[in-house]
């Protein structure tokens, strides 16, 4: 390739000198008149040769040429745009139908609605950084920045770093977009501990893959602006993240083993901690207390979530397009601060902490089997317990769900879900279940993709 580049440069340079050689055969009378034009032609030829060499070198290295040289010709006209400079732009539509007999369980109360349209813009910025932007569009939040981060891909020592907003590396399913799940919604333990749409954070993330014991491991650590969203309608007298102890800190250790050519296992542990604004109530009235222009005064209380997750995958080499199996389980425990410190400026008021206390745990187990090239069946069992310190009554949620998943192509997905839920004690999910505390839900989902970002079948 280097010989080709050198030859191309010499040919162009030689072409630029041809007029200079022909000048020796001309008369001395007009040689001076043509000297300036020859010099300009030679300069243009040299510039063109340099441009060609740089473009060839950039092409051989797999990197885009300099933007100032793209589409520029000697005449000043603009040529074709280098496709390497164009980012990958895609969109994913997520449509959900709720046929639950007791009424819709969707946040907006709709029976059929576009839950979200996600627009992704992704590209390599230069040889050192990659940028990813994911925008979520829906009727409730309009346009929201779901993720926007810059990834450093050329750090020494095998490290990779991100800065911006990203999905927090807590557990297994929280690291996937909701439309990429093999279920319509996140498991109940993730929805309760991390949020209905999962947990994101804005800050710095560092990871590294290594294999000191003969199998692959990955360590991930993050520092973000705050741990999730504050309690709805609650504000503190000073920012939760005013001190470094108010930031959100997370860590995750992933372990990966190949059991055979057709199967592998992943076992991971993760934790996240930070402070969140939790409500305070007036000790005399027992209700939330608005003061000094705040809808409801709150206090910064520490909350920690720890968990472990397990994933087994099987896909035979001879039938990889038609058969596969996934078994996944995840356990989480939420630990809440019992008596957070009340800010000094609130000591003159009679306040009582009204946020979550103690700890509670939950888990899910999910299995998915591929029947044909495009058809999958799945089932999930959820359990979520409530801390008995919340109101003295205790409580739990148990759910069993079944799924039928169909991929017409790699750019579309159709899914049907049936879920039976039973609650006792504290109402955790559906506040209007009545004396039976049971609910049957029927959800339908259609997901489609435009562009390179598409639903993942496995």
PLM feature spans:
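Outer-membrane beta-barrel translocator domains and adjoining extracellular loop/strand segments
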Residues: 101-107, 138-149, 175-179, 231-238, ...
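Outer-membrane beta-barrel pore domains and translocons
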Residues: 92-96, 136-138, 166-168, 222-226, ...
């Amino acid at each position: 390739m280097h010989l080709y580049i050198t030859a191309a440069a010499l040919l162009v340079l030689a072409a630029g000198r041809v007029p200079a050689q022909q000048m020796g055969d001309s008369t001395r009378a007009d040689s001076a008149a043509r000297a300036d034009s020859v010099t300009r032609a030679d300069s243009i030829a040299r510039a063109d040769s340099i441009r060609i060499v740089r473009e060839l070198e950039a092409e051989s290295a797999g990197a885009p040429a300099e933007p100032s040289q793209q589409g520029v010709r000697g005449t000043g006209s603009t040529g074709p745009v280098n496709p390497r400079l164009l980012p990958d732009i895609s969109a994913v539509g997520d449509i959900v139908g709720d046929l639950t007999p007791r009424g819709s369980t969707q946040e907006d109360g709709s029976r059929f609605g576009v839950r979200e349209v996600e627009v992704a813009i992704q590209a390599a910025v230069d040889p050192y950084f990659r940028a990813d932007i994911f925008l979520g569009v829906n009727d409730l939040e309009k346009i929201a920045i779901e993720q926007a981060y810059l990834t450093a891909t050329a750090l020494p020592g095998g490290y990779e770093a991100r800065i911006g907003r990203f999905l927090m590396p807590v557990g297994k399913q929280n690291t996937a977009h909701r439309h990429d799940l093999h279920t319509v919604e996140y498991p109940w333990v993730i929805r309760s501990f991390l949020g209905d749409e999962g947990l994101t954070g804005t800050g710095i993330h560092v990871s590294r893959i290594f294999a000191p014991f003969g199998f692959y491991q990955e360590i991930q650590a993050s520092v973000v602006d705050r741990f999730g969203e504050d309690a709805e309608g609650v504000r503190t007298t000073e920012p939760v993240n005013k001190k470094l102890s108010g930031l959100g800190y997370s860590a995750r250790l992933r372990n990966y083993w190949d059991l055979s050519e057709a199967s592998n296992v992943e076992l991971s542990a993760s934790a996240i901690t930070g402070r969140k604004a939790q409500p305070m109530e007036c000790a005399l009235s027992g209700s939330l207390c608005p003061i000094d222009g705040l809808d409801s005064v709150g206090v910064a209380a520490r909350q920690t979530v720890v968990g472990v997750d397990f994933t087994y995958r099987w896909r035979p080499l001879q039938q990889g397009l038609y058969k596969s199996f996934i078994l996944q389980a995840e356990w989480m425990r939420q630990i809440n601060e019992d008596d957070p410190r009340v800010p000094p400026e609130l000591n003159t008021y009679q306040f009582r902490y009204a946020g979550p206390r103690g700890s509670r745990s939950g888990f899910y187990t999910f299995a998915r089997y591929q029947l044909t090239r495009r058809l999958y069946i799945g089932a999930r069992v959820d359990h979520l317990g409530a801390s008995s310190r919340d109101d003295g009554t205790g409580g739990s949620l148990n759910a069993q769900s079944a799924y039928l998943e169909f991929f017409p192509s790699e750019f579309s997905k159709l899914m049907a879900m049936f879920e039976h839920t039973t609650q006792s004690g504290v109402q955790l999910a559906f506040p209007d279940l009545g004396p039976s505390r049971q609910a049957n839900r029927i959800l339908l989902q259609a997901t489609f993709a435009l562009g390179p970002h598409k639903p993942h079948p496995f």
